[in-house]
């Protein structure tokens, strides 16, 4: 499943990078926004189908009754967190394609090291929560990153072109973004 969503992220970053590099910054921003909405919706749909069909699907692997229950609930947990995770992943890839490699990477590593890993460890080792509760803590940094990165995506500050045409279009793009911000305020 991860390879499929990685492919969507790569395709999104290519589309965004091509537009930003060509100086079509508004179109690059539009593609990134669309990808950050459509790809998580695809993730949600696929995981929902898998959750609904978990019995026939996972019975192919000869899992016992207890394992089947766990896979069902793990899919339900991932139904929510997977969509959020895909959104964050897509945003990060689009940031990189738009010339911003630092913000998404720092948020990803920082979220894991300072939020998810400690929270998961505390949930499992200190609080002795059941496995499924501990499993859900693995994805907690995704919520934090979603809340921080989504406004960053929408503001377009991550667009930092590396090419001549992209750089030439940057000042006008920033002016348009400021005007949009003033109209929205």
Segments predicted by a language model, with ranges:
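Residue-level recognition of transmembrane alpha-helices
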Residues: 39, 75-78, 82, 108-109, ...
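Membrane-interface helix-loop junctions in multi-pass transport and translocation proteins
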Residues: 54, 60-62, 68-69, 102, ...
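Intrinsic disorder in cytosolic terminal tails and internal cytosolic loops
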Residues: 159-185
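Small-residue-rich hydrophobic transmembrane alpha-helices
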Residues: 1-54, 86-107
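Alpha-helical transmembrane segments of multipass membrane proteins
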Residues: 2, 42, 46, 50, ...
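Alpha-helical transmembrane segments of multi-pass membrane proteins
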Residues: 1, 65-91
